[in-house]
């Protein structure tokens, strides 16, 4: 499967769950923070792809990256992605989630 397809499926699943729980705006803020973190901190990608860095350490990095308190749904999602060894897809998932949210809310 290609990166776009996999990333899109994860982003759509997260958006659907967040919407069902009424947390799509909160998750949007967290995903925006994640996307911004990847843009501002290029080393973040390297740390995520480093097999020496443990999953709990990667979760800490991704939840503390933007300096804001993240919601539980975001943290659970990050754990799921890392458990399936899809951390390299996180930037793409974040951008797709942001696009889905903006499309839904008619934000240009």
Kindly give the residue locations of the regions a language model identified.
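Elongated, mostly alpha-helical coiled-coil "stalk/stator" tethers of large membrane protein machines
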Residues: 1-108
């Amino acid at each position: 499967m290609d990166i776009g397809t996999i990333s899109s499926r994860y982003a759509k699943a997260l958006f659907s769950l967040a919407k069902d729980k009424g947390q799509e705006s909160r998750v949007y803020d967290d995903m925006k923070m994640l996307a911004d973190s990847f843009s501002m901190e290029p080393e973040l990608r390297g740390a995520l792809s480093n097999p020496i860095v443990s999953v709990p350490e990667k979760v800490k990095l991704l939840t503390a990256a933007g300096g804001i308190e993240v919601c539980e749904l975001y943290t659970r999602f990050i754990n799921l992605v890392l458990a399936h060894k899809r951390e390299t897809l996180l930037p793409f998932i974040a951008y797709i989630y942001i696009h889905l949210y903006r499309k839904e809310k008619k934000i240009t």
